[in-house]
């Protein structure tokens, strides 16, 4: 009788321990799940923070470049053209290379630093081209700066924050690392407004609206292949 009682007691104890182990495993799974959710959230927040910082840097850097371009070239008759080799520049050689790109000239003159010369999103040096303020003239009295390698969300974000600070805003296909000098040079700052292509120009005395920015035609080039062309007279 005692042996039987001991037997049942032993089984009961084993069942209790088994249940304890099961609960412990379940708790571990729950904890790991919570950690996974938190980690995923942290990654998303970190990515947003990095993107926000990149956008802030682009704003500051392009403003510095805009001021420096005017100081350097405004009295020279016309602005210089973009070069096809701008995309090959690095922070290590941008201030010493023989390349005639405007961004190189600004570095050599000490107007801007190498760290201000690059788009933090695409990793490319800013491509700067000459532009026509009056499409009926052959003299390039304006210039444009390209921000390349943008996905749709970042492209629209930049438009909302920077678009109305410039005289001209256009959208082109511009993947990271791709030369766009031919398209930039000769940009007409007085071009007609065109949905998804020319959002602002000297011919239209209108600011870019939120409706323009969220239009299906705006920044709709797949992947991170959108480029914004900001122009100044």
Model-derived segments and their meaning:
Residues 1-21:
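N-terminal leader/signal peptides at the extreme start of proteins
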Residues 21-33:
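N-terminal signal-anchor/signal peptide hydrophobic helix marking the start
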Residues 28, 48-55, 144-148:
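Short, charged/polar micro-motifs that form catalytic or ligand-binding hotspots
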Residues 32-53, 71-73:
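C-terminal juxtamembrane segment of a hydrophobic transmembrane alpha-helix
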Residues 49, 61-80:
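N-terminal alpha-helical signal peptides/signal-anchor transmembrane segments
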Residues 58:
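Glycine-rich anion/phosphate-binding loop at the beta-strand->alpha-helix junction
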Residues 72-109:
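Short, glycine/small-hydrophobic-rich surface segments
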Residues 110-233:
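Intrinsically disordered, low-complexity regions enriched in Pro/Ser/Thr/Gly and acidic residues
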């Amino acid at each position: 009788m005692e042996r039987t009682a001991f037997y049942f007691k032993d089984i009961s104890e084993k069942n209790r321990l088994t249940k304890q182990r099961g609960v412990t495993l379940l708790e571990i799974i729950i904890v790991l799940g919570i950690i996974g959710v938190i980690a995923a959230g942290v990654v998303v927040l970190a990515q947003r923070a990095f993107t926000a910082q990149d956008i802030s840097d682009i704003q500051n850097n392009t403003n510095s470049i805009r001021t420096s371009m005017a100081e350097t070239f405004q009295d020279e008759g016309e602005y210089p053209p973009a070069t096809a080799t701008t995309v090959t520049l690095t922070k290590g050689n941008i201030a010493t290379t023989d390349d005639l790109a405007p961004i190189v000239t600004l570095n050599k003159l000490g107007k801007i630093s190498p760290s201000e010369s690059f788009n933090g999103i695409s990793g490319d040096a800013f491509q700067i081209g000459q532009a026509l303020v009056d499409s009926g003239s052959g003299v390039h009295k304006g210039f444009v700066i390209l921000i390349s390698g943008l996905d749709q969300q970042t492209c629209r974000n930049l438009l909302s924050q920077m678009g109305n600070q410039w005289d001209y805003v256009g959208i082109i296909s511009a993947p990271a690392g791709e030369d766009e000098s031919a398209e930039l040079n000769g940009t007409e700052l007085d071009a007609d407004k065109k949905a998804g292509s020319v959002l602002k120009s000297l011919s239209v005395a209108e600011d870019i609206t939120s409706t323009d920015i969220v239009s299906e035609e705006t920044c709709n080039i797949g992947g991170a292949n959108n480029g914004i062309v900001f122009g100044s007279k």
